[in-house]
């Protein structure tokens, strides 16, 4: 099945130029994956579903306002940010990752695909949010990272402006209870949790609204968000 057909099955409509950009992006990921660990998914049709559908289906569930700023925390090989950027060129993206090799690869992807209003930054989230350039500067923070919701919220919510949103792409929604207290401490409130399936796998989108500023002591350093979650 072609990528276009797969996307159509999930009600994701892209033009031919956008499809071509996604396919070129996949080729870049799979080529670099031969010398660097970017993804365990190397079969193309599976890549279409697990990376492209998984990233783009968010646009069917959440309405991002036009021309807004988004930071993707722990972006890895660029998911979900780069597919969303290809689909929604109006959005302005920052891709954050703590591994320099990955960030160098993402910069190459941005150049190869001629994407604009998008940058890749090499930094740890807990360091990045200590700077005025990044703290509470974004309309949205999105993440597909595997951390538990309480840990993820401590890394992500400090980036979000009051009135903005953190969007967490998770597995089953039964873990959201774990994060509720942390989210409140960090200035957020779970607005909704949307359950859905991708390729018969349970997924959930946790939408968190930033209702007040995050206290300056967060995020904590020294690995505390993971070792000792709020």
UniProtKB/Swiss-Prot annotation:
Keywords: Cytoplasm, Methyltransferase, rRNA processing, S-adenosyl-L-methionine, Transferase. S-adenosyl-L-methionine binds at residues 74, 79, 125-126, 144. It is an enzyme of class 2 (transferase). GO terms for cellular component: cytosol. Its EC number is 2.1.1.-. One of its GO terms (molecular function) is rRNA (guanine-N7-)-methyltransferase activity. It comes from the Bacteria. It is found in: Cytoplasm. InterPro entries: rRNA_ssu_MeTfrase_G, SAM-dependent_MTases_sf. Belongs to the methyltransferase superfamily. RNA methyltransferase RsmG family. PANTHER family: S-ADENOSYL-L-METHIONINE-DEPENDENT METHYLTRANSFERASES SUPERFAMILY PROTEIN. Specifically methylates the N7 position of a guanine in 16S rRNA. This is Ribosomal RNA small subunit methyltransferase G. The gene is rsmG.
